[in-house]
Amino acid sequence: KNNLFDGILGFATDEDSQKLIFNGYLNLELNNNLNFGEQFLLNYKADGKDQQNFRARLTLPYLFNTPFGLITELKIFKRDSTFSTSDQLIKVRYQINPTSKTYLGYKAYESSNLRKDNSINIDVEDYTSKFLLAGLSYTKTQNNILFPIKSKFHLDTEIGSKETKITTESQLRASLLFYYIFNLNYKNSIYLKNNTKAVNSDSYLINELFRFGGINSIRGFNENSIDASFYSVLNSEYRYQFNQDIYIHSIIDFAYFENQITALKQKLY
């Protein structure tokens, strides 16, 4: 892969606090610059006031010329003046064969309530949580420059506990990603993708729920605008490929989600 860089960043003054705020996005991807397959990703996105998203990820494969690799990641999400959440990940990857990998690791979450007025009960609290995680992935490639990956399966499970100022309770989190390209012929194909996530707990906070919506999940909704304790999104596309560089596609997305805090169960499309 080539190195990639793309971004637009701006700044303005908040009318209420008079503080400097940033908006825009930044995407940086560095691949194999040290010639042993390493990858560094840096993503930042902010819309000025409502939310900020930061992600940094380092992948070091084949440590000491073995099938073992190391992955570290930091994510920070801030929703206006309501809360901020960070999660830190470290996991060891084992390359079973060219298409399959397994993972073992540790993940920690930390979230802070940013509200100045705590008299309004919106189920946001400070909390920390710690998890042991295990996962596996399978990737199949194909001879296509535009769509080099034909199918992918990725499963992650996290077992641990959440601690607030009042309680400590066990939690289980799981995520599944699957997609497949059905090649009708060289120019025509159908793309299907499913992304499912769930958290099981005795109680729930808004700032620990999954967030989805936007171009990377269900298109047509604002990014990260939907909070869910469980969701499943199905993306489908019909693709027509003109050549190795250009294609057009249709979009049909479906989703189902549950929010245990509001007892909401809803379908989206």
Predicted features and spans:
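Gram-negative/organellar outer-membrane beta-barrel architecture
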Residues: 2-154, 182, 211-214, 224-231
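C-terminal transmembrane beta-barrel domains of outer membrane proteins
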Residues: 22-29, 41-43, 55-57, 151-269
